[in-house]
């Protein structure tokens, strides 16, 4: 069922949304089949562009620091059901144009890093690229959410180059350490189980686990710095020894 252009379109959509189940709303969003598929294809292209940028940065930094700052990169395209639900919840029309204009998180790239400092180094290098435009930045590492959630979120705009045009597309990029990602994944599974009541002691335990996760990140990063310092000193000592034991010039 496709919505027609008319002065009553908004009222008709609100009426439909108040009665349709989520699956049918999803079908409604996809009623503009070809334009919808094209738009999702553009978002997939944008995700590939961003993922490639981080793979290149990871390769460069691994040569510079002798380790990979990126543990893994995950991408996801928002499902039709989630798109429809978000448009409905925010009171936006169910159109392809509305998706592109009003939603920033259709395309998502999650970068899992070894240490918190890697997050900021990668984010800074990424944002310095001249074809990346920062639209929004939310630092939940410096200022965690009340439940303990930590991550760095960026909304960026990047071009994709098609055979006959260039399109600017928005992508949400999330940066987490391994422990941040582990906590967020398990918190989601625990909190969003069906029919689970809001339990204060569960929330407290989750928050305490988030604090422990943050402490673990800090301790592991401290150990990494100690190891790097020791390795640098050992390398300097070996170079000095080589110079002292070198052949004498007569």
Where are these regions (language model features)?
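Terminal, regulation- and interaction-focused segments at domain boundaries
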Residues: 106-113
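An acidic, glycine-/histidine-flanked metal-binding catalytic module
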Residues: 2-47, 54-60, 172-250
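Long beta-strand-rich cores associated with HINT superfamily self-processing modules
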Residues: 100, 113-222
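Charged, alpha-helix-enriched surfaces in structured cytosolic catalytic cores
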Residues: 41, 45, 78, 82, ...
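A cross-family "folded-core" feature that marks the main globular domain of proteins
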Residues: 42, 46-53, 65-66, 70, ...
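Glycine-rich, low-complexity intrinsically disordered segments
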Residues: 8, 15-19, 40-42, 69-75, ...
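A glycine-rich, hydrophobic loop/mini-helix early in the fold
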Residues: 60, 65-106
């Amino acid at each position: 069922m496709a919505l027609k252009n008319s002065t009553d379109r908004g009222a008709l959509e609100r009426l439909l949304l108040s009665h349709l189940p989520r699956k049918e709303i999803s079908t409604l969003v996809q009623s503009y089949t070809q334009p919808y598929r094209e738009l999702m294809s553009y978002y997939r292209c944008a995700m590939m562009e961003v993922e490639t940028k981080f793979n290149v940065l990871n390769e460069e930094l691994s040569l510079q620091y002798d380790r990979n700052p990126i543990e893994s990169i995950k991408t996801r395209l928002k499902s039709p059901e989630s798109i429809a639900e978000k448009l409905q919840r925010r009171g936006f029309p169910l159109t392809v144009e509305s998706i592109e204009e009003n939603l920033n998180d259709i395309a998502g790239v999650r970068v899992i890093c070894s240490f918190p400092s890697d997050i900021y180094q990668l984010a800074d290098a990424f944002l310095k690229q001249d074809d990346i435009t920062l639209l929004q930045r939310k630092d939940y590492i410096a200022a965690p959410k009340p439940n303990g959630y930590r991550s760095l979120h960026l909304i960026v705009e990047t071009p994709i180059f098609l055979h006959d045009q260039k399109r600017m597309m928005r992508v949400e990029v999330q940066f987490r350490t391994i422990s941040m990602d582990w906590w967020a994944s398990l918190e989601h599974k625990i909190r969003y189980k069906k029919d689970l009541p809001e339990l204060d002691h569960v929330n407290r335990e989750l928050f305490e686990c988030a604090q422990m996760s943050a402490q673990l990140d800090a301790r592991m990063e401290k150990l990494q710095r100690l190891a790097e310092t020791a390795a640098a000193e050992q390398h300097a000592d070996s170079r000095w020894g080589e110079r002292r034991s070198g052949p004498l010039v007569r």
